[in-house]
Amino acid sequence: MTRVIEATKLNFKEDELMRIAVLSDIHSNLYALEAVVADIESRGVDVVVNLGDILYGPIAPRATYERLRELDFVTICGNQDRQIYQASAADCATNPTMQFILDDLGPEPLQWMQQLPFDLQLNEQVYLCHASPGDDLIYLVDDVSQGFAQLRSEHEILALLEGQTSPLILCGHSHTPRVVNIGEQQLLVNPGSVGLQAYRDDWPNSHVMENFSPHARYAIVELTAQGWTVAQYQVAYDIQKAVALAELRGRDDWAYALVSGRASN
C-alpha cells in the first residue's frame, strides 16, 4: 500500500511544496552525493527527495549512509537497498561486493533501509517510486528488450502505472534522465543517477544503460502557474576518489563506468 506522508512532518505547508530536488541511485558514491548537495544548496529548494538504490556499491556505503542521515532527505527504498538487507550467505559467496557492503555498513543501516517505504505519496500532486508502482525491478519508462534503453509506448507506461494518477510521477532505477508526458495530465520525471552513469544487467534480458559522461545527475522540478517545470543537472565531482575505491575493491567495471559513463565490455 502506498504510504502517504503529511506535509506538516516535513516542516512546510502543502501549498508551499513547489520546488523539489530529485535524487536517485546514489550507489554509495559519497563524492558524487556531496557535489550534488552543494549544487542543490546553491539553487535553493523546498525539499529533497531520494528515490532509492542508496548504499549498494564498492565506494563508501557507510560514509554515504552517515551523510544521508545528517541530511534527512525524504527517502524511499530501491531494489538494491532491499537486496542488501535480504542478502544471504549464498549471495555474499557469489558476490564479494555484497559481502564488502555488509561488512562496511554494520547493522544500523540495514535497520534503516528496512523501514524505508516502497513508494510514497508526497502530496496530492507528487508520487514517488523507485522503478514502477508495482515492482522495484521494472523500468517504468525504459524498454530494454533490444539491449539498450528506448522509450516505452504510452500504453505500456499507463499499464505499469497501475492506476496511479498523480500529476507528477518521480521515478529512478534506470539511471537514465527522462521527462515524459503521459496524456495531458501527467508528467513522469527520472532524474538519472547521482552515483553511477553506466552499467550492464541481465534482467529482464541482457542490456546496457549508458549516459556517456561521468557527471553526477539529478533534477529540480518546480510547480509554476503554467505547470511543472523540469531542470536536469549534470554536476562535475572528484571522480578519481570514487574510482580508487572501486578499484581497491576489485570492481574495474565500476571504475570504467565512473570515468567514462559507458559500460565495460
Language-model features: locations:
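N-terminal active-site segment of His-dependent metallophosphoesterases
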Residues: 2-73
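Beta-strand-turn-beta hairpins that frame and shape the catalytic cleft
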Residues: 12-21, 121-127, 183-186, 227-228
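Active-site neighborhood of phospho(di)ester-bond hydrolases with catalytic His/Asp-centered motifs
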Residues: 23-24, 48-53, 57, 74-79, ...
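Active-site environment of divalent metal-dependent phosphoester hydrolases
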Residues: 27-31, 56-59, 80-85, 121, ...
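Glycine-rich phosphate-binding loop signature in dinucleotide/nucleotide-binding domains
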Residues: 40-44, 122, 162-165, 220
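Active-site neighborhood of divalent metal-dependent phosphoester bond hydrolases
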Residues: 64, 70-128, 134-165
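Anionic-ligand binding region
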Residues: 154-182, 186-189
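Acidic, His/Gly-rich catalytic cores of divalent-metal-dependent hydrolytic chemistry
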Residues: 181-265
